[in-house]
Amino acid sequence: KCNFRPQFSKPVLPNISSEKEGSADEILKKNSLDGLKEKFLKVFKIEEKYLKTNDQYLKYKDRLDHELKIIIEMKYPSYFLIVSDYIKWAKNNDIPVGPGRGSGAGSLVAWCLSITDVDPIKFNLIFERFLNPDRVSMPDFDIDFCEEKRDLVFKYLTTKYKDSVAHII
């Protein structure tokens, strides 16, 4: 008679921290804030010197801080950084990437990191549908790559993250 009960634990993600850039939490905060500033400069055409007094920017910054707090508390900064990394790599290597769909499109952090191309505040999307402290499962971005070139993305991931990569077909 077998009496095996599997033990489930939190996913183990590669360590994204570095001496130069700091912890994954610090890198996520910096990259997200840099991304938000870039969106306001390019999308909203607001000069950087006016950001700290712009009501719209302050609204976005409050939402960003709220999301970052939850992501960090739930220990998912590395996940967001890894997804951002391979999506930016794909875009820089002429691999078409979908704009973002599913509940992940509700994340302002994802938009700031270029994971999605959807401004969740503009479309009244709710972050907590994607990630909240009551959720037991790991968040999951629905990402679409060009079918002809998606193997290149997997090759990039396995080259960079080695044994930390798994792929379900």
PLM regions with names:
Residues 1-169:
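Phosphodiester-processing cores and adjacent nucleic acid-binding clamps
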